[in-house]
Amino acid sequence: MPLTDLIRYFNTADSAGDSMLYPEGERAAAWHRGLRLSSLFQPIVDLRQERIVGHRATLAARREDGTPVGSEAAYALCENAEAVVHFDRLCRTLHALNFLAQRRYAGGYLQLPIH
């Protein structure tokens, strides 16, 4: 399924309406309450086999003016537990879409942080 179709599906399923995934080149990005969200991937290396076995996703968040916001500070903006769950699902979806989009460059498994 093309990235744009997946994004449309997830945006339709977002009943809260305060978040939006969107295509950005060959990857996905998201807006959530004034923050622009994107994914960074760090390789996970098996030292015995001397090869990359996967990637760990990290959230990159910026305010509208471009000021970086740490991931913990981004989560701290959530007012309650339900908002944390929604934001966490948005971030994991964003990371999964971006990992799929780069699968021809990076294989292995995807490690996701969960809050």
Task: List where the protein language model places each region.
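Flexible, charged surface loops at secondary-structure boundaries
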Residues: 32, 79, 103-105
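Conserved nucleotide-sugar donor-binding catalytic segment
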Residues: 82
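Catalytic core of bacterial c-di-GMP phosphodiesterases, primarily the EAL and HD-GYP domains
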Residues: 85-115
